[in-house]
């Protein structure tokens, strides 16, 4: 099982979309299935997963951007957003976010 950690950006964003229980349920899912999201093209391995939120299905829910750090057995949650707010974040931009976090 992987450890799930969050960036400071994610910590500020999640309360806009989830309850504490929803956040915990998602973390539990990622800990067991870290490869559940699709790899975003040209992102250097960053993944995106759709997740439902109360009152919506997956298509109306949120998108969570994360990467799996296999060596440390960690899943790092980077960003969360509603699809209605942001259509897509391109791979090269996500790659830059990851590089900044690794420095």
Residue ranges of model-derived segments:
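Arg/Lys-rich, positively charged N-terminal/basic patches that mediate binding to nucleic acids
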Residues: 1-22
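Residues that recognize and position ribonucleotide moieties
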Residues: 3, 47, 87
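Short, intrinsically disordered, mixed-charge
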Residues: 19, 32, 99-103
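Short, solvent-exposed recognition patches
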Residues: 21-29
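A short, surface-exposed loop/turn module that caps and links secondary-structure elements
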Residues: 28-58
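Short beta-strand micro-motifs in enzyme catalytic cores
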Residues: 45-49, 63-64, 76
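A short, structured beta-strand/loop element
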Residues: 54, 58-73
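Enriched for short, Lys/Arg-rich terminal
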Residues: 68-103
